Amino acid sequence: MIDLKYLQNNFNEVSMKLQKKGVDAASLEHLQTLFKTLKEANAKLEAAKAEQNSMSKLFGQYKREGKDITELKAKVDANKEAMVPLQEAAREAEEALYAVALAIPNLPDDSVPEGADEEDNVELIKVLEPRSFDFEPKEHWDLAEKNGWIDFERGVKLAKSRFSVLRGDAARLERALINFFLDTNRERGFEEFCVPFMNNAAMLQGTGQLPKFEDDLFKIEDEDLYLIPTAEVPLTNMYHDEILAEIDLPVLMTGYTPCFRKEAGSAGRDTRGMIRQHQFDKVEMVAIAHPDNSDEVFDMMVQNASDILTALGLPHRVVELCGGDLGFSAAKTIDLEVWLPGQNKYREISSISNTRDFQARRAKIRFKDGKKNRLVHTLNGSALAVGRTLIAIMENYQNEDGTIEIPEVLKKYM
């Protein structure tokens, strides 16, 4: 959540920054009204409290002096009763402000490029040259069918559309990728975690999925539980409402989980193959960092994801997202896009974000800085999306007869 005090004192500046993310200034004006309502409610309540304190002191004085307190006591009781609706009004005003503030996205960094959507993202560098084929490369679904690797029909039968079944060598390759990703992340200093695949609403609110994106989540009926859309949720919230020692920063975490998303806004997009599924596997990196060095941690995470792709021999490019393509919680995001020769285009395979103190404020994650507590910075990113890496290997390592080679670094895992 953005700093409400900063928003109140710098409304025009915040409004201008959020326009970079496509947030209409008019939608923020309601917040100004709520700020005013809360200020007025608190002023009335504080005035009533001041009067109550004054009468309470007078009450004690009357008793010491032996004066008749009947009339004064009636006034004290009446004022106390009058404070009840004032307290309720202040509480309701604060809750209304908080509810609206939860739906306001994070401020983009000043360095984030201007732009409306992914077409305006900025390519920073290309890593590895795409392979030159002497035949027409096939797309992954054709290769999967030829090799019997992915069963889309049985995925639909078992669940619904956008589910699939991996079998044989594809299932083994999926497991190999997960182990390779986790091993690499651990070698870079990330501690491995195995976390619940369901989290409660408070955790999803902490990382920003709730309340704004509830329609994209799978909720467990009659339970305060949701299937996680990413391991970012449990890993970041590992320190929900906790105070860390400054010496322990940064905290680097990694974990493998399946991820579950309704893909509510993706109707008609990537309907064939495994690019966009309701359930997919991912290895996540999460960092809880000191505000002074979160940029260094961010660069390390980007490099780590790129190094994994390089080790797999997969051509990719590094792209900085423009304001209009930034996620809700992100202040800055770098995407890694892998080359898919069958589609003849780069596709996102990792998205690494620095949320600054946005998630930390929502999740109350702090560190002890001398005598005071400060909010940490939280960062997250894939290293990597497993299914999309599997697709990239299939398309980049295919032979003319449809068989698929295995990258050298994965052979020991298979």
Swiss-Prot record:
Q: Which GO terms describe its cellular component?
A: cytoplasm
According to its UniProt record, which reaction does this protein catalyse? tRNA(Ser) + L-serine + ATP = L-seryl-tRNA(Ser) + AMP + diphosphate + H(+); tRNA(Sec) + L-serine + ATP = L-seryl-tRNA(Sec) + AMP + diphosphate + H(+)
Coiled coil location: none
Q: Which cysteines are joined by disulfide bonds?
A: none
Q: Name one GO biological process term.
A: seryl-tRNA aminoacylation
- Keyword tags: Aminoacyl-tRNA synthetase, ATP-binding, Cytoplasm, Ligase, Nucleotide-binding, Protein biosynthesis
Kindly give the SUPFAM superfamilies that the UniProt entry links to this protein: Class II aaRS and biotin synthetases, tRNA-binding arm
Which residues of the sequence carry a binding annotation for L-serine?
T230, A231, E232, E284, S382
**Ligand binding (ATP):** R261, K262, E263, E348, I349, S350, S351
* Principal localisation: cytoplasm
- Give compartment(s): Cytoplasm
Its annotated pathway reads:
Aminoacyl-tRNA biosynthesis; selenocysteinyl-tRNA(Sec) biosynthesis; L-seryl-tRNA(Sec) from L-serine and tRNA(Sec): step 1/1
The yes or no answer to whether the keyword Aminoacyl-tRNA synthetase is present is yes
What PANTHER family does the entry give?
Answer: SERINE--TRNA LIGASE, SERYL-TRNA SYNTHETASE
- Domain remark text: Consists of two distinct domains, a catalytic core and a N-terminal extension that is involved in tRNA binding.
**What is this protein's function?**
Catalyzes the attachment of serine to tRNA(Ser). Is also able to aminoacylate tRNA(Sec) with serine, to form the misacylated tRNA L-seryl-tRNA(Sec), which will be further converted into selenocysteinyl-tRNA(Sec).
**Subunit-structure text:** Homodimer. The tRNA molecule binds across the dimer.
Report the protein name in the record.
Answer: Serine--tRNA ligase
